[in-house]
Swiss-Prot record:
Protein name per its UniProtKB record: (-)-alpha-pinene synthase 1, chloroplastic
Cofactors named for this entry: Mg(2+); Mn(2+)
UniProt enzyme class: lyase
Native source organism of the sequence: Picea sitchensis (Sitka spruce)
Subcellular localization, as worded in the UniProt entry: Plastid, Chloroplast
Length: 627
């Protein structure tokens, strides 16, 4: 990876480079670009909640806009200082023994009925077991056992739901809600209409005034089920409203306990922003304190010990991957790019929260690299670069030739090379996994992405405020979701032949919706700070332009309603039981959407990364759990 040169750019040199036979436009633009050396910031970067605009004066006197973002929070010395002993073989051997014992626990549920598993509890025990290993983050070891358990449960599923066991006379809410959620997440065809059976004669979900622990747990699972809604499922919306209100009220009545903490976690994060490794970390705490588990026929101590071991063993791999990532960041010349945010550790954390299988290092590191580059480009196109420079950069990138960088301002050369080298590197990794060259395909995705940024840069420069439709279509591309996901998923041990890839990547509905939610949610968190930096166009401002008299609150209500619809659409694209594309092929694109959504849950967590995002890094990457 080439380092960024800080030597002055000889402007005339680019005039003598033959960029291509069709590059007359590049040469013309190049003549208009002044020499640009290292820039001087008018204000130092400190952690800022306002994301105010600072002025930067370059060596040639060009006034440049720059967001006042805080610096990288995770320096090399800190990353190198992290230590862990959980990479030792003894921990892996202990985990393997526990995996074998948990498999025996699964298999015992398939044997003849005994004292612990009977016709009166065989369904709820299977569903509870599957739900537990998934929430603890250890399900990858039990794929066959999970399928066998759910096939069994589904064989007894009916339009009335299920009871605790196959011989239960009446369906109960807890078994049906948890069964519905788990079956739907695994692609089984289950109708949400089954939840209507738990309404009273007035069409309302019924509950008792006493709010017993058993009932609270049932409503908690109803709430969890309601979040896996498909478009048009009114009963799911009703269930979500009812159960959320019920659970909020229950927190005022019950004592502080593992149950109250579980309720708080689920209400706080829902499903779309409850990233799997974060949920595993939280559920380890809850699971170990839950007295209800002692009533189960399952040996919960073994599940808990395995979950802790797996969490910490992966933690040792994270340390090695972080050390590599920080070296890559330094060697790429990124530290010299003072005009942009540096959030490579945060992006790696998001990737490791949605894909913590050891074999998916390429995905985690590829995602972190791609997102780091996207952030550099975002800050360059939105604030630092001039329109003439950005046009030159966009045209040069489409040539895909290192010599094209000779015509660029000095600060852009480093950006060009990190993008060029990294995309080529990930393409080589993808070729190993997929057995075919995907570089041209990836380049087209990056070309579209840069074109969308160029459009936005022109809007900023001219002060043009587009219509909502104009902004939305361009904004889905400039969100960066596609370029962040495409090459990382191609490095995985999941086959993506062309007919599958087009159902996951562009022009699929899954890709469109994933890009949409990133654009819309990002706008709701960033539009005020963007406006302060001179970036007027957002879904909020464009909606207000199209609807004279609409307030910001009206616009936000409209955008939030769109987001809710998009989430249900995403659920359908992932879990449609009639889809010809396996869930495993779509899952990581979907989960990337969840990861980005988490980053915008409270604020712009990529600009202000020193609050919730920092906590996520510490809890899921830096700190192991106590065995």
């Amino acid at each position: 990876m080439a380092l960024v040169s800080i030597a002055p750019l000889a402007s005339k040199s680019c005039l003598h480079k033959s960029l291509s036979s069709s590059a007359h436009e590049l040469k013309t633009i190049c003549r208009t670009i002044p020499t640009l050396g290292m820039s001087r910031r008018g204000k130092s970067a400190t952690p800022s909640m306002s994301m105010s605009l600072t002025t930067t004066v370059s060596d040639d006197g060009v006034q440049r806009r720059m967001g006042d973002f805080h610096s990288n929070l995770w320096n090399d010395d800190f990353i190198q200082s992290l230590s862990t002993s959980y990479g030792e073989p003894s921990y892996r051997e202990r985990a393997e023994r526990l995996i074998g014992e948990v498999k025996k626990m699964f298999n015992s549920m398939s044997s003849e009925d005994g004292e612990l598993i009977s016709p009166h509890n065989d369904l709820i025990q299977r569903v509870w077991m599957v739900d537990s290993v998934e929430r603890l983050g250890i399900e990858r070891h039990f794929k066959n056992e999970i399928k066998s358990a759910l096939d069994y449960v589904y064989s007894y599923w009916s339009e009335k739901g299920i009871g605790c066991g196959r011989e239960s006379v009446v369906a109960d809410l807890n078994s049906t809600a948890l069964g519905f959620r788990t079956l739907r997440l695994h692609g089984y065809a289950v109708s949400a209409d089954v939840l209507n059976l738990f309404k009273d004669q007035n069409g309302q979900f019924a509950c008792s005034p006493s709010q017993t622990e058993e009932e609270i747990r049932s409503v908690l699972n109803l709430y969890r089920a309601s979040l896996i809604a498909f478009p048009g499922e009114k009963v799911m919306e009703e269930a979500e409203i009812f159960s959320a209100k019920y659970l909020e009220e229950s927190l005022q009545k019950i004592s502080v306990s593992s149950l109250s903490q579980e309720i708080r976690d689920v209400l706080e994060y829902g499903w779309h922003t409850y990233l799997p490794r974060m949920e595993a970390r939280n559920h380890i705490d809850v699971f170990g304190q839950d007295t209800q588990n002692s009533k189960s026929c399952i040996n919960t101590e073994k599940l808990l010990e395995l979950a802790k071991l797996e969490f910490n063993i992966f933690h040792s791999l994270q340390k090695r991957e972080l050390e590599y990532l920080v070296r890559w960041w330094k060697d790429s010349g990124s530290p010299q790019m003072t005009f942009c945010r540096h959030r490579h550790v945060e992006y790696y954390t998001l990737a490791s929260c949605i894909a913590f299988e050891p074999q998916h290092s390429g995905f985690r590191l590829g995602f972190a690299k791609a997102c780091h580059i996207i952030t550099i480009l975002d800050d360059m196109y939105d604030t630092f670069g001039t329109v003439d420079e950005l046009e030159l950069f966009t045209a040069a990138m489409k040539r895909w030739d290192p010599s094209a960088a000779d015509c660029l301002p000095e600060y852009m050369k480093g950006v060009y090379l990190i993008l060029y080298d990294t995309v080529n590197e990930m393409s080589r990794e993808a070729e190993k996994a997929q057995g075919r060259d995907t570089l041209d395909y990836a380049r087209r995705a990056w070309d579209d992405y840069l074109d969308s940024y160029m459009q936005e840069a022109k809007w900023i420069a001219t002060g043009y405020l587009p219509t909502f439709a104009e902004y939305y279509e361009n904004g889905k591309v400039s969100s960066g979701h596609r370029t962040s996901a495409l090459q990382p998923i191609l490095t995985m041990d999941i086959p993506f032949p062309p007919h599958i890839l087009k159902e996951v990547d562009f022009p699929s509905k899954l890709n469109d919706l994933a890009c949409a939610i990133l654009r819309l949610r990002g706008d709701t968190r960033c539009y005020k700070a963007d406006r302060a930096r001179g970036e007027e166009a957002s879904s909020i401002s464009c909606y207000m332009k199209d609807n004279p008299g609409a307030t910001e609150e009206d616009a936000l209500d409209h955008i939030n309603a769109m987001i809710s619809d998009v989430i249900r659409g995403l659920n359908w694209e992932l879990l449609n039981p009639n889809s010809s594309v396996p869930i495993s092929s779509k899952k990581h694109v979907f989960d990337i959407s969840r990861a980005f959504h988490y980053g915008y849950k409270y604020r712009d967590g990529y600009s202000v990364a020193n609050i919730e995002t920092k906590s996520l890094v510490k809890r899921t990457v830096i700190d192991p759990v106590t065995l």
